[in-house]
Amino acid sequence: GIKKILTTCPHCFNTLTNEYPDFGAKFEVIHHTDYMLGLVAEKKLVPSKPVKGKVAYHDSCYLGRYNDIYESPRQILQAIPGVELIEVEGWNKKKGLCCGAGGAQMFMEEQNKDRVNVKRTLQLVDALGNPTNKGNAHGHGAHTIASACPFCMTMLKDGVKSQSLEEEIQNLDVVELLAQSCGVGDPAPATNDSASPAA
């Protein structure tokens, strides 16, 4: 039978960890940030390329408050050269504001004009300071909002878009930043194995 399940979704992590055992499930559930941090600790992944810029980390409700996983995502970010981890003072970890996706809220149109995801996005943007890298969100020195939950990613991406900040702020999973630093996805270097056509 299945012994371990690896999940990128804190909602799935919570359900599989805390509810499935009531129905006889017996397996270990690992969130991808815990798993990837283990690979970094074992030197199987070595973040070496600088990923410059400020990174504001958003705590997912189901990863943090429900399952007390706060440090793994932060330790990954701190292991990446060039990253300046920014905390939203007074609104992080156990006091972090929800992204607004919980309880299927991401599928509802709120009656008032103040959507929770926009409020949270503005908190994160304020913590990053004035984004001055216009037109360079995917380059060096970019400001980044990072999370470790696909639901949060969707809500925060919508929040960034609602403020027309897509050019100034990128929204990435913590592990996407780790992959960048490890060179995952970089184009292969050119080789001289094939002869160039004669001129």
Language-model region placement:
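Iron-sulfur cluster-binding electron-transfer modules in prokaryotic oxidoreductases
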Residues: 1-199
